[in-house]
Amino acid sequence: MTTRTIDNIRNFSIVAHIDHGKSTLADRLIQTTGTVALRDMSEQMLDSMDIEKERGITIKAQTVRLEYRAEDGKDYILNLMDTPGHVDFAYEVSRSLAACEGSLLVVDASQGVEAQTLANVYQALDANHEIVPVLNKVDLPAAEPDRVKEQIEEVIGLDASEAVPISAKTGLNIEAVLEAIVKRLPAPKGDREAPLKALLVDSWYDVYLGVVVLVRIIDGVLKKGMTIRMMGADAAYGVDRIGVFRPKMADIGELGPGEVGFFTGSIKEVADTRVGDTITEDKRQTTQMLAGFKEVQAVVFCGLFPVDAADFESLRGAMGKLRLNDASFSYEMETSAALGFGFRCGFLGLLHLEIIQERLEREFNLDLISTAPSVVYRLLMRDGELKELHNPADMPDPMKIETVEEPWIRATILTPDEYLGGVLKLCQDRRGIQIDLNYVGKRAMVVYDLPLNEVVFDFYDRLKSISKGYASFDYHVSDYREGDLVKMSILVNAEPVDALSMLVHRTRAESRGRAMCEKLKDLIPRHLFQIPVQAAIGGKIIARETIRALSKDVTAKCYGGDISRKRKLLDKQKEGKKRMRQFGRVEIPQEAFIAALKMDD
């Protein structure tokens, strides 16, 4: 490709809230530009995992190269970067945006602007993108394009007078979107003669090709046979294959400035290719590195254990394979007295946790139990040491701790007016601090600071049920704050169960402990001796329930006769039960763990 045609390249991404029709629009663009023959088209072309299609969400960012002849008679190359919409995958969004110059903002004309639309738009604005608003689903009877245009102008502050009204489902007005991309989005800039400088956008593992690296060329040219250097990881590799995606891989000779494509080489591990790294030619290196991405930090941790201990090795292998494709997922070995061997895993959020667990169960046929999700706490010890606590069971002696800090989030909630009271009460109950409350048309936009610990359990489910599914929620971790947090242990028959221990705020410890004990009382089967179920903070018991003993009638075989005979048998039974209570083991069934962790308040 010559320098002349860098003006005919457009790199763009599509940002939208879940279900506003982003993947469907991508399908239509692919179809309209004739990139894929009609007989090969399928729904959600760019969502390659089954789980993405089933849940209707995009998890991994994908790219596709479209070739389009515009009304001005010129041929354009459009590189579409499909991005996920969900907050857990915000880092996938940020790296797709960094490789583009513009974005299409897709808003559902019947739903209007949602919380995650906002979050992603702000990311696009941070990346200095030109943004073209697109109103989707205008063919629905409930569509109100004019109201939504006003909303876009009010909430986001974008000029929506030239928003393109489309229906991605029926294919209405898709040509207008392509024209808007060509006319309104800027062309990339780059110098073909300069040393190679490229941004590593993504990498994944392919069984046949090894590690495949997705790059956006800024300056210079990437050719076959070249030796390249990753500047951040400081490693050099040979380039075997270069190509682009027309959803399927297609080989080409070279990638020039402004282009997006992939290469494969002698790279063994995905971990060697850090997203956001700068790639340059080994012989002729560029002097300055690109501003990379932030390292992704795991926010939520939980233990994953195989139901059958024999599956431990398969679980280890499965995790290694998933780690190849998802560098944001981290894990380390841990053992639990109650659950045996397993792993402590770190995730970006709750959806990420669910998806990893579902992929492990589905793609590798494993049966898993997960322990209660927890967040990372910071402990300042009396001797001045700073510790990070990932697992509540490892909490050191409270006497040695000076302060405990927990992560807080800044949450933006958009909800219809009539559910506002319930939403505010929910946030208040979760120790929230109200920051802001605005009205956008008939909807309230509430901004709250909340402790992440309170959100991790079931905040999202509760929010959806309070608002009948209409409220949308988006958050980012803002900072760490000191809190009066205590470790609550659950004791069954005076034995602590490590998998059920958690850190809670002192004010909520009692209600949480009581609820947990009541739940376990119903779930643990009765034994021949009485079992106390207790919640404790340190040595102090804060809640207790008792599982009654099954009683065996030992005097059944005595007909009448002397009372002392019966008493002797009853005393003998009492003796036995006492001994049993001392040495008897209480089996806690699997369901009890799972149900106890899904606890409602």
Curated annotation (Swiss-Prot):
It is an enzyme of class 3 (hydrolase). InterPro entries: EF-4, EFG_III/V, EFG_V-like, EFTu-like_2, G_TR_CS, LepA_C_sf, LepA_CTD, LepA_IV. Its main location: membrane. Its EC number is 3.6.5.n1. It holds the Pfam family LepA_C. SUPFAM superfamilies: EF-G C-terminal domain-like (SSF54980), P-loop containing nucleoside triphosphate hydrolases (SSF52540). The keyword Coiled coil does not apply. It is found in: Cell inner membrane. GTP binds at residues 19-24, 136-139. Required for accurate and efficient protein synthesis under certain stress conditions. May act as a fidelity factor of the translation reaction, by catalyzing a one-codon backward translocation of tRNAs on improperly translocated ribosomes. Back-translocation proceeds from a post-translocation (POST) complex to a pre-translocation (PRE) complex, thus giving elongation factor G a second chance to translocate the tRNAs correctly. Binds to ribosomes in a GTP-dependent manner. HAMAP family: LepA (MF_00071). This is Elongation factor 4. It comes from Methylorubrum extorquens (strain CM4 / NCIMB 13688).
